[in-house]
A protein has these predicted regions:
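Short loop/turn motifs at secondary-structure junctions
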Residues: 44, 77-78, 109, 132
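Short Fe-S-cluster ligation motifs
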Residues: 68-86
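Canonical radical SAM enzyme core domain
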Residues: 54-68, 89-133, 140-146, 166-170
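Conserved C-terminal portion of the radical SAM core fold
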Residues: 79-82, 134-135, 162-172
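N-terminal [4Fe-4S]-dependent radical SAM core
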Residues: 1-34, 54, 75-77
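Hydrophobic faces of well-ordered beta-strands that scaffold small-molecule active sites
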Residues: 31-35, 80-84, 113-115, 136-138
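Short glycine-enriched, charge-decorated loop/helix-capping segments at active-site entrances
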Residues: 51-59, 150-163
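Canonical Radical SAM [4Fe-4S] cluster-binding loop centered on the CxxxCxxC motif
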Residues: 21-64
């Protein structure tokens, strides 16, 4: 289904997944938004297009994000989830905190907030403690710290795995 959103058409799934011989059922229109807040990253992962990117600042606008979320709702499209990603979001943690603050307003507080992080920086740990997150994905591509350091192309401090004060039920 195409929905006119401020003069641009967005495609929104109209039916749920068909299970066996069951007929398809209509679903209410919804979207998940992926918000890349920066290309900058503290790691140099061999497999990542953002590996070691130095560009930290982003032309990202928090008021524009809030306006889009509200506008989609007004257009009858439910914003189910906002995924905050990067690069590494914690390299622009003040911006991410502004997003969380804006998404805590009554008209946006029903949107699921998700963080994707490598969790290696002290500010990553601080961001993960924020109560507005509904879920958090932490990229741990190996259980062995030495091998993980090789994959990430940087040394990993033991403090990176200090989850004190972080709601582990939100961590994936």
């Amino acid at each position: 289904m195409l929905i006119d959103f401020r003069g641009k058409y967005i495609s929104v799934k109209e039916f749920d997944c068909q299970l066996g011989n069951q007929p398809k059922a209509r679903i209410a229109p919804f979207v998940n938004l992926f918000v890349k807040v920066t290309k900058g990253c503290n790691a140099k992962c061999l497999f990542c297009s953002n590996a070691g990117a130095l560009e930290v600042q982003s032309p990202f606008s928090v008021p524009k994000l809030i306006d889009i979320v509200k506008g989609l709702k007004e257009a009858g499209v439910r914003v189910s989830r906002v995924n905050v990603t990067g690069g590494e979001p914690s390299v622009v943690s003040p911006l991410v905190e502004d997003i969380l603050s804006g998404m805590s307003a009554p008209e946006t507080s029903d949107v699921h907030m998700h963080l994707n992080t490598n969790g290696l920086l002290p500010q990553s740990q601080e961001l993960m403690r924020h109560p507005r997150w509904d879920s958090i994905s932490m990229s741990l591509h190996h259980y062995d710290t030495k091998k993980l350091s090789e994959l990430y192309g940087c040394s990993i401090a033991e403090s990176a795995f200090g989850f004190e004060g972080i709601n582990l039920q939100k961590l994936n």
